[in-house]
């Protein structure tokens, strides 16, 4: 199973009681020049082996939103990604990967509140990056690219699950409930 997530704290919530040998936390960071030109190969290496769960802090979908807006990829790379990603995911699923794509959505007001709280907190100031401040100024572009991503990459076998994350705990519980209901396991009770 492969889960796409945006926040490391949500991943911690999901994985807190899992046995460490059965899941991977994947945070790839800034791509090398080669990885930037071989986007799908970069992510293929990070996928789970049979019987494992991988939690992706960010995912291949940074190519669909963040990278083109921030100038980290060119138009050709963006278009190539958008053209190929559905088939790539379809192949993953045919080869046994159970893919769940969560998108944790945050309102602009809530994003600004959280950024201000981080900026003014002695415990959280380090979480605020220069990119965070740039991103808020490009909110409309992010919204446009996000909508394009949903429209072009939500498929019947690989839909997006959009979670309102203005309230962090409700978002985590909602996504966990979704995942538990979707997953088959012994003595399952639908919640």
Language-model regions, residue ranges each:
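Short glycine-/polar-rich loops that comprise or flank the Walker A/P-loop
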Residues: 19-23, 49-52, 93-100, 121-124, ...
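Hydrophobic positions on the alpha1 helix immediately C-terminal to the Walker A/P-loop
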Residues: 9-10
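NTP-dependent small-molecule kinase module
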Residues: 121, 144-191
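Conserved nucleotide-sensing/catalytic segment adjacent to the nucleotide-binding pocket
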Residues: 20-82
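Short, small-residue-biased leader/transition segments that mark boundaries at the very start
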Residues: 1-2
């Amino acid at each position: 199973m492969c889960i796409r997530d945006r926040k490391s704290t949500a991943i911690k919530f999901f994985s807190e009681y899992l046995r460490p040998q059965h899941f991977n936390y994947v945070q790839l960071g800034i791509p090398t020049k080669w990885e930037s030109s071989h986007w799908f190969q970069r992510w293929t290496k990070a996928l789970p082996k049979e019987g494992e769960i991988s939690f992706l802090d960010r995912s291949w979908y940074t190519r669909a939103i963040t990278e083109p807006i921030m100038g980290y990829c060119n138009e050709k790379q963006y278009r190539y990604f958008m053209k190929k990603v559905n088939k790539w995911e379809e192949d993953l699923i045919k080869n046994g990967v159970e893919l769940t794509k969560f998108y944790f959505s945050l309102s602009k007001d809530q994003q600004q509140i959280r950024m201000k709280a981080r900026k003014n907190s002695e415990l959280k100031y380090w979480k605020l990056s220069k990119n965070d401040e740039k991103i808020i100024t490009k909110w409309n572009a992010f919204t446009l690219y996000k909508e394009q991503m949903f429209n072009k990459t939500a498929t019947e076998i690989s839909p997006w699950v959009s979670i309102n994350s203005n309230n962090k705990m409700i978002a985590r519980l909602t996504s966990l409930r979704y995942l538990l209901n979707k997953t088959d396991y012994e003595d399952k009770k639908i919640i």
